[in-house]
Amino acid sequence: MSFFNIVIAILAFGVLILIHELGHFVLAKLNDVKVEEFAIGMGPKLLGIKGKETQYSIRALPIGGYVKMLGDESKSDDPRAFNNKSSARRLSIVIAGPIMNLILAAVLFCIVGMSEGIALPTVGKISANSPAQKIGIKAGDTIVKINNYSVHTWEDISFNMALNKGEGIKLALKNNGTIKKVTLVPQYSKKEKMYLIGISPKFIDKPTIIEGAKYGTSETVTMIKTVYLSLKMMVTGKASAKDVSGPVSIIKVTGAAANAGFIRLVNFIAFISAQLGVMNLLPIPALDGGFVFLFLFQMITGKKVDDDKVGFVNTIGFALLMILMIVVTIKDVVYPINF
């Protein structure tokens, strides 16, 4: 793992943290909440600038960041305190961070699509004597479902194919307004080291800004579905803990993406940004999603949960997340990704 990889990874992750925390910061200001500190990084402070009422700082450990608001950890009687705002206002502040990451992902995917062209979920070419040709799939067929999962991008197809172990695949194809359903068994490719059905996508070489924006949005939706499907596979035992990547693997992959070119790096940052946005929305204590769940509960039931109890649960949740980070870091060392 080179020094270059580490620097690129820190800079890339720093951008993701900045955008995420900026979402919290802007919504806090819009809701007239006093922000005491805006920090990029955790741990000891390296640099700091004091604004009118907010301390802006860069900290030593590039593993996160935070927006410290008056009344977000302890009660305050100040009307500008976070704890004195309505559940709806607090919800808007908390959810803004993950949403900003998803917006960033969509913008970056749009840039990638505009730069490299867009692979559509439509068949462009078919390999001779392939399962696709034998079953009657034709160029121009658009794949709308694969194994009952809706398809919006070519990556939806690629993800499902990457998981295939030689089992039959159900496809729903659309052509000229007609839907056709087929089932085919993929063939193993020694070259690609995976099972394939023998199709390649139709490309838009020079997409318009509208097509690029649509691609960016669709690609982000695909990433959201991929994260939740991956989590489902982990919970049901269909995926191994070895497949979980930690900081070491992310640094390696970021470096490899940078070496492959600027657009590849942008694509990977978009991928991580989408993942960061989705993972932060999980209803887990100490994550934004835990607060989203809490504030929605309070809005629906009209009942306020004791702040001290919330603080205790979040402290436990944060400790468990730190333990998980240590575990996946150790896993990265024991089961490293090699290039």
Swiss-Prot record:
PDZ domain residues are 99-177
Record GO terms (molecular function): metal ion binding; metalloendopeptidase activity
Q: How does it sit in the membrane?
A: Multi-pass membrane protein
Record-level GO BP terms: proteolysis
User: At which positions is Zn(2+) bound?
Assistant: H20, H24
What this protein needs as a cofactor is: Zn(2+)
Indicate where this protein is primarily found: membrane
Localisation per UniProt entry = Cell membrane
Q: Which InterPro entries match?
A: PDZ_6, PDZ_sf, Pept_M50_Zn, Peptidase_M50
Q: What family is this protein classified in?
A: Belongs to the peptidase M50B family.
Specify the protein name.
Putative zinc metalloprotease CA_C1796
Q: Report the source organism.
A: Clostridium acetobutylicum (strain ATCC 824 / DSM 792 / JCM 1419 / IAM 19013 / LMG 5710 / NBRC 13948 / NRRL B-527 / VKM B-1787 / 2291 / W)
Source taxonomy lineage? Bacteria, Bacillati, Bacillota, Clostridia, Eubacteriales
